[in-house]
């Protein structure tokens, strides 16, 4: 734990995160749990008062305050007149700013971790040319969601190992 996990498709970065848990079964299957920077947004709480700031400016300030890396933060266009958040998670603060932008402009943005950098992208332009299954090296995945820890994206890629007859994670 504590190491860096990187997933790439050729030279395109897909996931950059930090290993927080490693498990091994009696069948020598290894499971690695890693989180990107959005995990830090959910784990930290703060109090903020914003006046006349856009959602992208709010995310930039949060990232600077908590020394998180940022990438492309699309100009969300809408200056939020006033937003007061007391003891809220950084993730909830950022999402409220994005929600207020949607409510007031009809434009939808997504906050995500773009290979180790927080990013805000207009959903109209967000698309990933990637597939999982036949013709790719990744033939399966697991997506978990639960009410207790639904705070991050968790992806588990597995590949059939023809040499060992097992699946490699």
Task: Cite the ranges covered by each PLM segment.
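Long, contiguous amphipathic alpha-helices that act as assembly "spine/axial" helices in icosahedral shell
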Residues: 90-104
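Surface-exposed aromatic
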Residues: 76-84
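Solvent-exposed loop/turn segments at secondary-structure junctions
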Residues: 25, 78, 126-127
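Acidic, small/polar-enriched beta strand-loop surface segments
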Residues: 95, 106-169
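Surface-exposed cap/loop segments at beta↔alpha junctions
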Residues: 2-70, 74
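Extracytoplasmic/secreted envelope proteins and their assembly/folding machinery
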Residues: 56-60, 91-95, 154-155
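Short, well-structured beta-strand/strand-turn elements
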Residues: 67-75, 101-116
């Amino acid at each position: 734990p504590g190491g860096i996990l990187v997933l790439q498709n050729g030279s395109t970065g897909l996931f950059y995160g930090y290993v927080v848990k490693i498990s091994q079964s009696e069948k020598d299957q290894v499971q690695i749990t890693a989180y990107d920077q959005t995990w830090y947004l959910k784990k930290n709480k703060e109090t903020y008062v914003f006046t006349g700031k856009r959602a992208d400016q709010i995310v930039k300030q949060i990232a600077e305050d908590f020394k998180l890396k940022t990438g492309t933060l699309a100009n969300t266009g809408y200056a939020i007149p006033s937003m007061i958040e007391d003891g809220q998670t950084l993730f909830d603060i950022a999402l409220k700013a994005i929600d207020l932008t949607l409510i007031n402009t009809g434009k939808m943005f997504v906050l995500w971790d773009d290979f180790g950098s927080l990013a805000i992208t207009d959903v109209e332009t967000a698309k990933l040319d990637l597939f999982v299954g036949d013709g790719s090296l990744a033939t399966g995945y697991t997506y978990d969601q639960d009410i207790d820890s639904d705070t991050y994206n968790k992806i588990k890629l597995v590949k059939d190992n023809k040499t060992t007859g097992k699946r490699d994670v």
